[in-house]
């Protein structure tokens, strides 16, 4: 059961059709009220419940604005209790702040078993999933994925995304090994030096990109 609080059911269906993710066992609802979400749970009796996102679901039993600390705490607590009683796997999608922490109450990280962070640069197809917390295994694992027109696909060897192939060595380039969690990655570093007159460029500058 997939509960979307940010997009309508028709919008989510269009995305699912584009990446060929329609399945007869997948139930979809667009709700922002906790009571309506519980009603769908009672009707569908799912094995997996996805809430997208926790900040968009509100409860009449709690005060405060939608997405606020009080609302997020109440909604998350109620859903976790229901899922534990009915043996349902719960996946909460949440927003993060600019510093990378989970938006809303910090207690969300303490009441869940696993925290996965999905990140990537705006102009790159590469996406990383980092395990911030994992009660069932290592918390320094990193998964690499390619964001394509057909969806998000796993990348077993992401070296090709960070390096370019040359028949002969190219001046100004080198390949280094960087460690993302416990996963070593090969990355290519390219250096470009430009010589100019002081009146044209002013003081020398060092600029990095990537």
What does each model-found stretch correspond to?
Residues 12, 52, 79, 94, ...:
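Residue-level signature of catalytic and energy-coupling elements of molecular machines
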Residues 24, 87-88, 110-114, 127, ...:
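Short glycine-/polar-rich loops that comprise or flank the Walker A/P-loop
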Residues 16-17, 101-111:
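Short regulatory helix/loop adjacent to the ATP-binding pocket of P-loop NTPases
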Residues 1-81:
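Conserved inter-motif catalytic segment of the P-loop NTP-binding fold
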Residues 70-91, 95, 111-122:
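Substrate-engagement module of ASCE P-loop NTPases
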Residues 6-10, 18-21, 32-36, 54-57, ...:
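Conserved nucleotide-binding/hydrolysis micro-motifs of P-loop NTPases
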Residues 2-6, 31, 47, 65, ...:
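Conserved phosphate/pyrophosphate-binding and hydrolysis machinery centered on Walker-type P-loop NTPases
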Residues 42-49, 55-57, 120-209:
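Conserved P-loop NTPase
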């Amino acid at each position: 059961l997939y509960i979307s609080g940010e997009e309508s059911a028709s919008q989510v269906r269009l995305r699912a059709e584009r990446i060929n993710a329609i399945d007869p066992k997948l139930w979809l609802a667009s709700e922002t009220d906790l009571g309506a979400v519980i009603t769908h749970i009672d009707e569908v009796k799912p094995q997996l419940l996805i809430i997208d996102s926790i900040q968009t679901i509100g409860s009449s039993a709690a005060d405060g604005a939608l997405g606020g600390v009080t609302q997020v705490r109440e909604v998350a607590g109620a859903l976790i209790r229901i899922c534990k009683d009915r043996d349902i796997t719960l996946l909460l999608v949440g927003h993060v702040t600019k510093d990378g922490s989970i938006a809303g109450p910090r207690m969300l990280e303490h009441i869940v078993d696993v925290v996965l962070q999905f990140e990537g640069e705006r102009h790159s197809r590469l996406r990383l999933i980092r395990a911030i917390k994992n009660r069932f295994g290592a918390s320094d694992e990193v998964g690499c994925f390619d964001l394509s027109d057909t969806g998000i696909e796993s990348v077993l060897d992401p070296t090709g995304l960070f390096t370019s192939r040359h028949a002969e060595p190219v001046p100004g380039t080198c390949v280094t090994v960087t460690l993302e969690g416990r996963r070593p990655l090969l990355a290519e570093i390219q250096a470009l030096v430009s010589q100019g007159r002081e009146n044209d460029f002013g003081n020398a500058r060092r600029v990095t990109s990537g």
